[in-house]
């Protein structure tokens, strides 16, 4: 009976992780991500409707309290199959923001390479390591640098045109956001493998909300940055009935 209960808990844990990863599908045009009641406490200090760029990312500076293990290898295999499809859609969604066209089939090849890395981690039955690796890949230079350059290039003109119509708090927030985007791009150019620094900058972006909607809409109508970063190792520490994302 104890073993059955443990297996059920693992099933629910994997289902919760995969459900949250589906929220990362940036090609969907469903108007944003549903928020759990607990999340409202973290965002109530922001203006109404503002959701952070990088919302939900774990704090890389804090120590992990432990690692979640998976007892059955078939659960990992099933999870990887689903993650392969969701990751492929996420990559395509991000690349839709960039004017730099990728060779046909490059997305699939990149995702398959990632999945091989994830599979190498399954020997330790450590789902947290898999999720951690996935986050590093999704925030890598290959994926985010071009979209961030495209967005950052539009800020100076936008800030100049809208300064008179924004209150001081809004203008300062968007200006801070622009500085963080420039800082992130510098890291991509000079320290592309510094995943800790990249993650920390993305966390700071949480405090600034999303980029101006007209900037993003100009690049790709319907695109929603709010779900970027919804996949987090911290969600594995939540109970099956309580999603922290």
From Swiss-Prot:
GO BP field: peroxisome organization; protein targeting to peroxisome; protein transport
Propeptide residue interval(s): 243-245
Biased composition (Basic and acidic residues): 33-44, 71-92
Lipidation (S-farnesyl cysteine): 242
A Gene Ontology cellular-component term: cytosol
Subcellular location: Cytoplasm; Peroxisome membrane
InterPro entries reported for this sequence: Pex19, Pex19_C_sf
PTM entry text: May be farnesylated.
Keyword Transmembrane found: no
Keywords attached to this entry: Cytoplasm, Lipoprotein, Membrane, Methylation, Peroxisome, Peroxisome biogenesis, Prenylation, Protein transport, Transport
Tissue occurrence: Expressed in roots, leaves, flowers, siliques and stems. Highest expression in roots and leaves.
Major location (coarse): cytoplasm
Region described as Disordered: 17-106
Biased composition (Polar residues): 96-105
UniProt key word Mitochondrion: no
Gene3D superfamilies: Pex19, mPTS binding domain
UniProt membrane topology term: Lipid-anchor
Entry-annotated residues carrying Cysteine methyl ester: 242
Subunit structure and binding partners: Dimer. Interacts with PEX10 (via C-terminus).
Function, as annotated: Contributes to morphology determination of peroxisomes, but not to import of peroxisomal matrix proteins. Required for proper post-translational import and stabilization of peroxisomal membrane proteins (PMPs). Acts as a cytosolic import receptor for PMPs and delivers them to the docking factor PEX3 at the peroxisomal membrane for subsequent insertion into the membrane. Acts as a chaperone in stabilizing or maintaining PMPs in the lipid bilayer.
Family: Belongs to the peroxin-19 family.
Name of the protein this chain belongs to: Peroxisome biogenesis protein 19-2
Native source species: Arabidopsis thaliana
